[in-house]
Every structure is written in structure tokens, then in C-alpha cells.
A protein has these predicted regions:
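Transmembrane beta-barrel domains of Gram-negative outer membranes and organellar outer membranes
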Residues: 1-111, 117-127, 135-140, 149-157, ...
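Predominantly the C-terminal beta-signal and adjacent terminal strand-loop region
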Residues: 192-234
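Residue-level recognition of beta-strand termini and adjacent short loop/turns
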Residues: 53, 57, 176-178, 201
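Outer-membrane beta-barrel transmembrane domain signature
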Residues: 37-40, 113, 117-193, 199, ...
């Protein structure tokens, strides 16, 4: 859903060398946050991520629904912040908190969460486990109110359209038997999903994933870029001085 992570769940991944990222994903209508039987509209997610420090990132996501473009335009937009509270160490998991900016009258893409992860090297490859908790509450903007702060209202996620997604405990596993790809399994509090991914030099990623062992598939592509355009060797030398 435009957030760094596995397939449909956020993770703790943090790109130290590539502070700018772009992502494109296609989610089938029956598993998108907006899908219902009357709409049947595949959702396209576009997102841009920017890291401003070693502990903070901002993410802009757009959910575009092609069949409704003439009525709603580009689509729903959401700004999220990620904060790295703990960096992974030998005996310490990584810990990240994600917060969505409130203010939407239809907060389908509003998700606050806490997630931790730990990686394990094995003789058969690299295994990483994620465990997180999605807030059951969202802040919604009531229409017809002139004052922004007076218009904010706290709702239960189950009362809005995306109610079962990232509502409570979620988690997942990724397994890399080789350096250029691997397999994924996750539970997003709504569905079980599984898939695979390929990567090229930590810069380009391609994912394909399946929902609930059904005929519905999603895909995503992402790319990472350094804000400092100097060669990596020069950037490393600068950090070491």
C-alpha cells in the first residue's frame, strides 16, 4: 500500500545509501482497500519515499482507481512518516513506528503502526521475521466544519471502509536462499498473502504475490536512488572522515 515492507504489510527496512525511492503497485479490486462488488476497480498505488535523516522518512502515496478517474481525478492521497526507534543489532531487533497525517474525510489509507524485525543468517540462506501492531483507531476530518482542529474526529477503523486491514497484530517472513531474490509470507490482519521477489544491487525490486491462494495476484516495482549523486566509494569515504 505504498509503504516499505513485504507485500501488504509495512516493515523496518531502512535504506542508508538510497534516501529516495519510488514504488508502483497494482492490487486487484477484491483485495484493495477500496474494493466492493459494486465498484470492481483495480487500484494502482504510486508512492515516493524520502529519507531526511538516519531515523526519519516521509512517504507520499496515491491510490489511483482508473475506472473512477473521471469522477475523483488522481485518487486518494496520503502522507506518512516513519521513525526508526531501534536499529537492528546482534541481539536487538529493529523497531519502526509509522504515523499517517490526519485530515482526510475518508481515511482509507490512514494507518498508524509499530513493527519490529530481526534477521537470521542460516546455512540455507537469510531469514527475516516481522511482527507488528496496527492501530485500531483513525483520525477522520468531519465535513462541513470550518475549523480544521475542531473537525478532527477519532473513529474505530472497523467502522470505515478499510476496517479489517492492519487492525491489530500482523506479521510476516521473508527468506532469501540467494542474494538476488527470495520468498515472502505474511498476514495483514485481513488475509494471508505469499509471493516472491527479485532485486538488482539493492536498487531495483520486483514483487509478485498472491492473496489467500486464490486466482488474484498483485505486482509491485520499486527503485532506490541516492540523494548524494557521488559514487558510493566517495560517499563512504566522506562518512568515514
Amino acid at each position: 500500500m505504498g509503504k516499505p515492507g513485504l507485500m501488504m504489510t509495512p516493515g523496518t527496512g531502512w535504506e542508508e545509501d538510497y534516501h529516495l525511492g519510488a514504488n508502483f503497485a497494482v492490487i486487484p479490486w477484491e483485495y484493495s482497500l477500496f474494493g466492493d462488488f459494486s465498484e470492481q476497480n483495480t487500484t494502482q498505488f504510486y508512492s515516493v519515499r524520502a529519507g531526511f535523516s538516519s531515523f526519519m522518512e516521509v512517504n507520499l502515496s496515491i491510490a489511483h482507481r482508473p475506472k473512477m478517474a473521471d469522477r475523483i481525478g488522481v485518487g486518494d492521497r496520503q502522507i506518512d512518516f516513519r521513525f526508526r526507534l531501534l536499529e537492528e543489532k546482534k541481539y536487538q531487533p529493529a523497531l519502526v513506528i509509522g504515523l499517517s497525517v490526519p485530515g482526510s474525510t475518508s481515511p482509507v489509507m490512514h494507518h498508524d503502526y509499530l513493527v519490529l524485525s530481526k534477521g537470521f543468517k542460516t546455512r540455507y540462506g537469510f531469514l527475516k521475521a516481522n511482527l507488528g501492531y496496527g492501530s485500531p483507531l483513525v483520525v477522520r476530518k468531519l465535513s462541513g466544519k470550518d475549523n480544521f482542529f475542531n473537525s478532527l474526529h477519532l473513529d474505530r477503523k472497523e467502522d470505515i471502509r478499510s476496517g479489517n486491514y492492519l487492525n491489530g497484530l500482523f506479521g510476516g517472513l521473508s527468506y532469501m536462499p540467494v542474494s538476488f531474490g527470495g520468498l515472502m509470507l505474511e498476514y495483514d490482519t485481513r488475509t494471508w498473502n505469499m509471493g516472491g521477489f527479485l532485486k538488482i544491487k539493492n536498487r531495483f525490486y520486483a514483487h509478485i504475490f498472491n492473496f489467500e491462494a486464490s486466482s488474484s495476484w498483485g505486482i509491485s516495482f520499486s527503485a532506490q536512488f541516492p540523494l548524494d549523486l557521488k559514487p558510493k566509494s566517495l560517499r563512504d569515504a566522506k562518512h568515514n572522515n
